[in-house]
A protein has these predicted regions:
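Sec-dependent N-terminal signal peptides
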Residues: 4-13
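Sec/Tat signal peptide C-region and signal peptidase I cleavage site
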Residues: 13-20
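Exported/periplasmic ABC-transporter solute-binding proteins
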Residues: 20-269
């Protein structure tokens, strides 16, 4: 009897492993450092046979992973570029874009900085290197230290688009891999300035500045009052199937969108 039970247990375990699926999700740090791990944890509680591999290394890596077939879902904080669409088409890949949330790119300074608001023009001048001292924008004299995301980041390019009239960043700017790293550096540097997604505004030692009087809050993003707002995306190769489709549906469900809001982004519905 015991041998029979053991055999049945082994058979059930083997069957479970055969039906288990690993969902590979790559791309945006903005989405992948906090939101998707939380969604995955909640999804796995309902679907324990599903495992996740999540790599949050920048939007470009997520889009490239869809082109190369190394992920089922690509996370991105920017739309695909024409060059990426062409590269995908050459491999028979057609992007399916799904907006999963909205975000605001918040400009942050050290918590001890007296500056509480900047104009869009001042932000462009600071990040492009035209303005290099805080005294030029109402702060105490001191050289401005600029922290940006690296070039694989969707936020890197979106900030240039939304805040810098597509100009290049100052040569002195320091490129970092993620939102949390930028917040940490600005928090340590009294003269620091950088940008992060809404979900990262709780970092110690930093504060968000208003932009033309509008502060980066979920309410202002939702009301379209904050100028540096943008959608956040999942990309798949065509209409997703299987576990990928179910995870996308879960993200868009009331439960998933509640998690979007809880993490600090703006739900789409």
């Amino acid at each position: 009897m015991k041998k029979t039970l053991l055999a049945l247990t082994l058979l059930c375990t083997a069957a479970s492993l055969l039906h288990a699926e690993k969902l590979v999700i790559k791309g945006s740090d903005t989405i992948g450092a906090k939101l998707v791990p939380q969604l995955a944890e909640e999804y796995k509680a309902q679907h324990p046979d599903v495992s996740f591999e999540i790599a949050a290394e920048g939007s470009t890596t997520g889009i490239t992973a869809i082109i190369d077939g190394t992920a089922q879902i690509g996370m991105a904080s920017r739309p695909t570029k024409a060059t990426e669409v062409s590269a995908a088409a050459a491999k028979g890949v057609t992007f399916k874009e799904t907006i999963i949330a909205f975000d605001g790119i918040a400009v942050i300074v050290n918590g001890g900085n007296a500056v509480s608001s900047l104009t869009k023009k001042q932000i462009e001048q600071i990040f492009s290197g035209d303005v290099t001292d805080w005294s030029a924008v109402g702060g105490k004299p001191g050289p401005i230290s600029i922290y940006t995301r690296n070039t694989s980041s969707g936020t890197y390019s979106e900030f240039k688009e939304l805040a810098m009239s597509k100009r290049d960043y100052a040569g002195s700017s320091q490129k970092l891999a993620g939102n949390e790293q930028i917040a940490a550096e600005v928090g340590k540097n009294p003269n620091g300035i950088g940008y992060v997604g809404l979900a990262y505004l709780g970092a110690s030692g930093v504060k968000a500045v208003g932009v033309d009087g509008a502060v980066p809050t979920s309410a202002n993003v939702q009301a379209k009052k904050y100028p540096f707002a943008r959608p956040l995306y999942y990309y798949t190769n065509g209409t997703p199937a299987g576990e990928a489709a179910r995870f996308v549906e879960f993200t868009l469900s009331p439960t998933g969108q509640q998690t979007v809001s809880k993490v600090g982004f703006v739900a789409i519905k």
